[in-house]
């Protein structure tokens, strides 16, 4: 229960309710009209909470996201959240169009998967979205949340919580399309949440009284005024949630935003995240520049801006949340780490200079001195 309240608070702290747009906030505004062929998916979803996922069929992580979206749909329906429309919009690029069927196979017929026309208006651009973004609209089609990586990653609970908030809370004001059944359901949910909030408070009060009573009988001294209380059981959001959208595009070279040591102390980071936090470079990969690139044809470090690592057996999938100036095909230290993404390619000296790292994790073209915490690199 406290975890749920913590998530709701974290979502509230997102600027403009988690929504973002070019130039001004799009929170609580209706989505711009967009079509797939002659279909208007948003119009078809009127009267329902609508979840729009921007997924790329050529991306392994996106296929996992689609599969998890199906799992989330089933979970929410089992809890009584029925009146929700789920929409997946595939990327407009040719590689994604060729693998559209792979994306569609990840979900049931209850989730609509749309293929964009390559020569049509790009829906992602129209919605000001990026890969793996989730846009959540209320029943009147008003944008309640626009979540990007890493908070749109479905192993985290933020998308689920955002859907529930859009379903039962009038964040954008009253909507006359809410059914009586949904109103009754939300009243029940609100009442149950209020009861759960009261129960721990009473138990905590009784526990404090019991401890004080026991201390009096045992002759224990009172705790010092300077004594700090133990850590809260409230689940905290990952570092940077409340300012995630504000800092998009203001990436600090070589460091994952959520790895800020001062902000992330005490948070329950995954093993992969902790490993990333210890590295100077986010991810050292061998990169080959695309033939179209005007840059020198040398190896480079692939510094993705919003890295997400997904363990699947021994495989590690790395992906970038947004396009960066230069394209490169990245080959990891192991065969299964091969990634083709939009990455920022830099020449080896610029990429590796002043970066503390383990030589085993570094680019083979770089030699690193852990004492001086510097690396020297040479071109192929």
Curated annotation (Swiss-Prot):
<keyword id="KW-0964">Secreted</keyword>
<dbReference type="GO" id="GO:0005576">
    <property type="term" value="C:extracellular region"/>
</dbReference>
<feature type="modified residue" description="Phosphoserine">
    <location>
        <position position="264"/>
    </location>
</feature>
<dbReference type="GO" id="GO:0008430">
    <property type="term" value="F:selenium binding"/>
</dbReference>
<dbReference type="GO" id="GO:0040008">
    <property type="term" value="P:regulation of growth"/>
</dbReference>
<feature type="compositionally biased region" description="Low complexity">
    <location>
        <begin position="348"/>
        <end position="360"/>
    </location>
</feature>
<protein>
    <recommendedName>
        <fullName>Selenoprotein P</fullName>
    </recommendedName>
</protein>
<dbReference type="GO" id="GO:0009791">
    <property type="term" value="P:post-embryonic development"/>
</dbReference>
<comment type="similarity">
    <text>Belongs to the selenoprotein P family.</text>
</comment>
<dbReference type="GO" id="GO:0005615">
    <property type="term" value="C:extracellular space"/>
</dbReference>
<feature type="glycosylation site" description="N-linked (GlcNAc...) asparagine">
    <location>
        <position position="365"/>
    </location>
</feature>
<feature type="glycosylation site" description="N-linked (GlcNAc...) asparagine">
    <location>
        <position position="195"/>
    </location>
</feature>
<feature type="region of interest" description="Disordered">
    <location>
        <begin position="196"/>
        <end position="257"/>
    </location>
</feature>
<dbReference type="GO" id="GO:0019953">
    <property type="term" value="P:sexual reproduction"/>
</dbReference>
<dbReference type="GO" id="GO:0007420">
    <property type="term" value="P:brain development"/>
</dbReference>
<feature type="glycosylation site" description="N-linked (GlcNAc...) asparagine">
    <location>
        <position position="83"/>
    </location>
</feature>
<feature type="glycosylation site" description="N-linked (GlcNAc...) asparagine">
    <location>
        <position position="370"/>
    </location>
</feature>
<keyword id="KW-0711">Selenium</keyword>
<keyword id="KW-0712">Selenocysteine</keyword>
<keyword id="KW-0732">Signal</keyword>
<feature type="compositionally biased region" description="Basic residues">
    <location>
        <begin position="241"/>
        <end position="253"/>
    </location>
</feature>
<dbReference type="InterPro" id="IPR037941">
    <property type="entry name" value="SeP"/>
</dbReference>
<dbReference type="Pfam" id="PF04592">
    <property type="entry name" value="SelP_N"/>
</dbReference>
<dbReference type="GO" id="GO:0007626">
    <property type="term" value="P:locomotory behavior"/>
</dbReference>
<dbReference type="GO" id="GO:0001887">
    <property type="term" value="P:selenium compound metabolic process"/>
</dbReference>
<dbReference type="GO" id="GO:0010269">
    <property type="term" value="P:response to selenium ion"/>
</dbReference>
<feature type="region of interest" description="Disordered">
    <location>
        <begin position="346"/>
        <end position="380"/>
    </location>
</feature>
<feature type="glycosylation site" description="N-linked (GlcNAc...) asparagine">
    <location>
        <position position="176"/>
    </location>
</feature>
<feature type="signal peptide">
    <location>
        <begin position="1"/>
        <end position="19"/>
    </location>
</feature>
<comment type="function">
    <text>Might be responsible for some of the extracellular antioxidant defense properties of selenium or might be involved in the transport of selenium. May supply selenium to tissues such as brain and testis.</text>
</comment>
<keyword id="KW-0597">Phosphoprotein</keyword>
<keyword id="KW-0325">Glycoprotein</keyword>
<dbReference type="InterPro" id="IPR007671">
    <property type="entry name" value="Selenoprotein-P_N"/>
</dbReference>
<dbReference type="Pfam" id="PF04593">
    <property type="entry name" value="SelP_C"/>
</dbReference>
<dbReference type="InterPro" id="IPR007672">
    <property type="entry name" value="SelP_C"/>
</dbReference>
<feature type="compositionally biased region" description="Polar residues">
    <location>
        <begin position="221"/>
        <end position="237"/>
    </location>
</feature>
């Amino acid at each position: 229960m406290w975890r749920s309240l913590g998530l709701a608070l974290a979502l509230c702290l997102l600027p403009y309710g988690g929504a973002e747009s070019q130039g001004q906030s799009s929170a609580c505004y209706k989505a711009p009209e967009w079509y797939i062929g002659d279909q208007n998916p948003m119009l078809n979803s009127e009267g329902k909470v609508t979840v729009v996922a921007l997924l790329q069929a050529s991306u392994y992580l996106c296929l996992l996201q689609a599969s998890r979206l199906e799992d989330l749909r089933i979970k929410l329906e089992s809890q009584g959240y029925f009146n929700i429309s789920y929409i997946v919009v595939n990327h407009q690029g040719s590689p994604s169009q060729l693998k559209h069927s792979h994306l569609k196979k990840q979900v049931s017929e209850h989730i609509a998967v749309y293929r964009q026309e390559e020569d049509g208006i790009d829906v992602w651009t129209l919605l000001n979205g990026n890969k793996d973004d989730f846009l959540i609209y209320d029943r009147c089609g008003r944008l309640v949340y626009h979540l990007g990586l890493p908070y749109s990653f479905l192993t985290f609970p933020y998308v689920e919580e955002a859907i529930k908030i859009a379903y039962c809370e009038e964040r954008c004001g009253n909507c006359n399309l809410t059914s009586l059944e949904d109103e009754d359901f939300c009243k029940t949910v609100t009442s149950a949440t209020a009861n759960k909030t009261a129960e721990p408070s009473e138990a905590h009060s009784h526990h404090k009284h019991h401890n004080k009573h026991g201390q009096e009988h045992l002759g224990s001294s009172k705790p010092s005024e300077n004594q700090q209380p133990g850590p809260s059981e409230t689940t905290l959001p990952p570092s940077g949630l409340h300012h995630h959208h504000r800092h998009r595009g203001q990436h600090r070279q070589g460091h994952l935003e959520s790895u800020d040591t001062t902000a992330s102390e005490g948070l329950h980071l995954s093993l992969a995240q902790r490993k990333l936090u210890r590295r100077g470079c986010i991810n050292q990969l061998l990169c080959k520049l695309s033939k179209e690139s005007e840059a020198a044809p040398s190896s480079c470090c692939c510094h993705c801006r919003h890295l997400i690592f997904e363990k699947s057996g021994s495989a590690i999938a790395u992906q970038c949340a947004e396009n960066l100036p230069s394209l490169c095909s990245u080959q990891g230290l192991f065969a299964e780490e091969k990634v083709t993404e939009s990455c920022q390619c830099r020449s080896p000296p610029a990429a590796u200079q002043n970066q503390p790292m383990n030589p085993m994790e570094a680019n083979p073209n770089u030699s690193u001195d852990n004492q001086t915490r510097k690396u020297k690199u040479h071109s192929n």
